[in-house]
């Protein structure tokens, strides 16, 4: 299916929104669009990327970010934070038809939501898999 979204060169913020989604929706997106094809059974926060003006059915999500507490090694590195004050981005997946900057937009809006929903979180950690040409 080719959508009008696929013809856009760069994401326009007014055309997209980010909101919390369920684990099942994340699993569908990760299975379809993430190279690892796997998702943890649990997650602390999950957000989906949606085209503005669409009905927000979970099936219409075109991307997701998944956040969990980081590994113990990360907590040791940042000693001034407790586990409850930290989250790590463990999965990020975007459908191919999402315009450029879709991933950055999703991460930014996810961070805003985390700040609102979890004011105790003071450290967010993200990783880039350089073997997959992520930066």
Please place each PLM-identified region on the residue numbering.
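An active-site-proximal beta-strand-loop segment
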Residues: 36-44, 52-53, 72-78
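Residue-identity detector for glutamine
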Residues: 23-24, 41, 54, 112-113, ...
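Acyl-donor binding region in acyl/amide transferases
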Residues: 17-20, 59, 67-135
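Short amphipathic alpha-helix that is part of the acyltransferase structural core
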Residues: 2-42
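Conserved beta-hairpin
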Residues: 30, 43-69
């Amino acid at each position: 299916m080719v959508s009008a979204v696929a013809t856009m060169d760069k994401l326009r913020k007014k055309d997209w929104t980010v909101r919390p989604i369920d684990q099942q929706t994340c699993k569908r997106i990760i299975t379809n669009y993430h190279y690892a094809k796997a998702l943890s059974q649990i997650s602390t926060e999950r957000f989906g990327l949606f085209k503005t003006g669409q009905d927000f059915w979970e099936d219409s999500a075109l991307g997701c970010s998944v956040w969990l507490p980081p590994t113990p090694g990360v907590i040791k590195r940042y000693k001034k934070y407790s586990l409850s004050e930290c989250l790590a981005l463990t999965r990020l997946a975007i459908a191919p038809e999402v315009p450029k900057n879709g991933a950055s937009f999703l991460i930014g809006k996810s961070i805003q939501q985390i700040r609102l929903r979890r004011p105790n979180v003071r450290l967010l950690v993200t990783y880039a898999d350089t073997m997959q040409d992520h930066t």
